[in-house]
Each structure stands twice: as C-alpha cells, then as structure tokens.
Amino acid sequence: IVGYTLVDAATGRVVGEIESVDDSTMNLLFQVRTADGDEVLVPAHEELIRNIDTEERRMELELPEGLLDL
C-alpha cells in the first residue's frame, strides 16, 4: 500500500501518494503526500476502499465529504 497513488473515488481526483500507514490510533490512517507537498491523514477503513489496482499501484477511496478541505 505504501507508494500507491490514492484517488478520490467520487471525483477521480488524485489525492497523492501513500507514504505510510499510521497504526498508533484506534483507527488506521494513511499518511498521504499531496502534489503540493502537504500531508493529509486519511481513514484507512475497509468500507471506504472502492478499488485497489495492484498493477497500477492505485487505490480508490470513498473519502468523507470535506476531508480534503480541512
């Protein structure tokens, strides 16, 4: 999963690259680096995952509304 491109399933927009998985909290989080160099923490819940393409190293996630606006 680390190194995969994270894509917003609703819009098709590339969020960024998954740099690590944070398991220090009750819920897993993907640490994602955006094209602008910002860091975004995204919930890594299986119900949010829409598709994983291992050949393209892409993961589509149904992101919670407004998450990227924070």
Which residue stretches match the model-derived regions?
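Peripheral interaction segments used for macromolecular assembly
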Residues: 1-70
